[in-house]
Amino acid sequence: MVPWLGPDDPFPPVERALGPATGAPGLLAASADLLPSRLIEAYLRGIFPWYSDGQPVLWWSPDPRMILAPAEFKVSPSLRKTLRRVLREPAWEVRVDHDFAGVMRACAQAPRRGQRGTWITAEIIDAYTSLYRSGNAHSIETWHDGRRIGGLYGVAFGRMFFGESMYADATDASKIALATLVAHLREQGLEMIDCQQNTSHLASLGGREIARKAFVAHVRRAVAEPPIPWQFDKRVLAALTGPAEPAAPSGIER
């Protein structure tokens, strides 16, 4: 039986989440509210909300947990070529927290294979925008010729980043944003990005699963640390690609 949380009820221990033999492995609790205070409590415990319109708020803590260690991020030759182009061409920008709500809306509208509708509801957008205003949620955005073409958003506490969703309106646009985030987190010495659940796309970029017990222990330590700065731009990509190449003469494609 999944417990129902009233406004003042704490989360149960994550070990009580439903197991793999159930139809909803990782489901921990349900509630009627998505208050910012509840959302903060969830992230500090390694719990996240995931539900659809018409459902109660469902809270999850899966075992195992998908994570991406910035030090293990895989840059393919084609992505490295793209990142070098981003570095050398002024038309490319990576902006941080420029249009947080816009990124969330774009993620909500992005088609997902095997999914109908979106879990990024108006209620979710309002709740995470509240975290953004308090400095605990961030967007990393890929811009080209003054137009936002991809990005991602997530939650940050201390030295922990919890990835939420990403989208791309152009090839590699979300990967550019992720690579820029990874480069910044490497620079700051962060050890882990929470990716919640396993996907082949994340695995191809270096993501892997770890036991929930290890994940929660890391979260407990990391969120207690002082927060990192969140001002950076595409120049951090040089750590992943080497120095930017000089611009090619007009009409020549590298």
UniProtKB/Swiss-Prot annotation:
| Stretch forming the signal peptide | none
Chief localization: cytoplasm
Supply one GO molecular-function term.
Answer: leucyl-tRNA--protein transferase activity
InterPro entries in UniProt: Acyl_CoA_acyltransferase, Leu/Phe-tRNA_Trfase, Leu/Phe-tRNA_Trfase_C, Leu/Phe-tRNA_Trfase_N
Q: Identify the Pfam families for this entry.
A: Leu_Phe_trans
Function (record text): Functions in the N-end rule pathway of protein degradation where it conjugates Leu, Phe and, less efficiently, Met from aminoacyl-tRNAs to the N-termini of proteins containing an N-terminal arginine or lysine.
The Swiss-Prot or TrEMBL record describes its family as follows: Belongs to the L/F-transferase family.
What's the protein name? Leucyl/phenylalanyl-tRNA--protein transferase
Species name: Burkholderia ambifaria (strain MC40-6)
